[in-house]
């Protein structure tokens, strides 16, 4: 992705705006932990490096999961693994929370920080979804649905930020309360074991008609449904905020909503392919999951770039085209039926290449425009004058 001169010039007009209504971060996390952690961070450490180190903790979590699941072929992991997941996610959230403060106190705030932060958050969202799926041992359909819903919330929030110009965090948001809940999920599993979430419990007789169609429940299903409900409320709030901003600026609501269409087109293809080739999804779930993760990360990145450069909204994502082609083929000619494995491995490779190229080019252009480094703070930073 190449940024033209006008887009680069518009970068200098960008001003970060956020509204955080989280009581947890305002009264507990920020004063008693995040502010204290910031004091021990060297002034020489670049904000983006802090963000990247935070992601590194989660990458370690992913590696432990992959080793135990695919090398040792275990579904239930040792307690220390779950404990390390909780610690890793807690550190990720902490580092992600202070990178902006580090940028302000070192005078290195720039649109690159916004792009870098959102890009890392997009990758982390997929990582945490994968860990949660493994912990709760969800079936294939529930696993796909969980990734769809979790990434939808993030995408809608990014779409909302584009139209409102403000990052809005509700009283119960994913980056704060949602992550804290997942940390608690990992920590409790380390103590109780994963069977704690999977054990069947009889529905109380006092629940009346609910007991007639739900005689048993699990703690895992209760947590899953609660988080789904909270996610739905946040999605609806983001839709409301964005559409109000569009109407206030005399924009087209239909045009604004069409910005969400590519996301739903992609996932319609995913679900239709799962219905057609369930065995393939069972054997290659990790491939499909990573594919969706990279497409999502690219989509979010392009939207953020459009936002900070005051560019038109990107209504189309070329990376979803192979998904659509495969879905149409599955229900018509069936040409790709016998080469699904090769097709998707090539597809993943293309997505990684496109996303990597996008990240490298955008970072290079923004750092050159501002005369800065991405992961270091120069001793004498120089700003390029227009």
Curated annotation (Swiss-Prot):
Keywords: Membrane, Transferase, Transmembrane, Transmembrane helix. The chain crosses the membrane at residues 48-68, 78-98, 136-156, 171-191, 213-233, 253-273, 285-305, 316-336, 344-364. GO terms for molecular function: diacylglycerol cholinephosphotransferase activity; ethanolaminephosphotransferase activity. PROSITE patterns: CDP_ALCOHOL_P_TRANSF. It is a multi-pass membrane protein. GO terms for cellular component: endoplasmic reticulum; endoplasmic reticulum membrane; nuclear envelope. It is found in: Membrane. GO terms for biological process: mitotic nuclear membrane biogenesis; phosphatidic acid biosynthetic process; phosphatidylcholine biosynthetic process; phosphatidylethanolamine biosynthetic process. Belongs to the CDP-alcohol phosphatidyltransferase class-I family. This is Uncharacterized CDP-alcohol phosphatidyltransferase class-I family protein C22A12.10.
